[in-house]
């Protein structure tokens, strides 16, 4: 569960290393985001010569959350850290590679490009 002020790792090669959620998109009273949701983030830490720089405000798709994700078959999946992938206004990834596993819940939210770039889908 991601809310405002939550720090996330960046799971792509866009140049950002850490981002902070500044808004959860999807309604004025929406408080939490989970896997597959789009949030607005501020880049807090970036590498030199990356596509993004510190202070940039961008959209991101949440790909990993530390909170349990319940599935219809009763199984539960959770990750060690919160992570996101930076996207542009058309919801296409800014980076060209995705690092680490992503859950298959992204498929239901139509983030097929992220699914295809990911090395492992859980």
From Swiss-Prot:
Keywords: Ribonucleoprotein, Ribosomal protein, RNA-binding, rRNA-binding. Transmembrane segments: none annotated. Pfam families: Ribosomal_L14. One of its GO terms (biological process) is translation. GO terms for cellular component: cytosolic large ribosomal subunit. Part of the 50S ribosomal subunit. Forms a cluster with proteins L3 and L19. In the 70S ribosome, L14 and L19 interact and together make contacts with the 16S rRNA in bridges B5 and B8. This is Large ribosomal subunit protein uL14. It comes from Afipia carboxidovorans (strain ATCC 49405 / DSM 1227 / KCTC 32145 / OM5) (Oligotropha carboxidovorans). The gene is rplN.
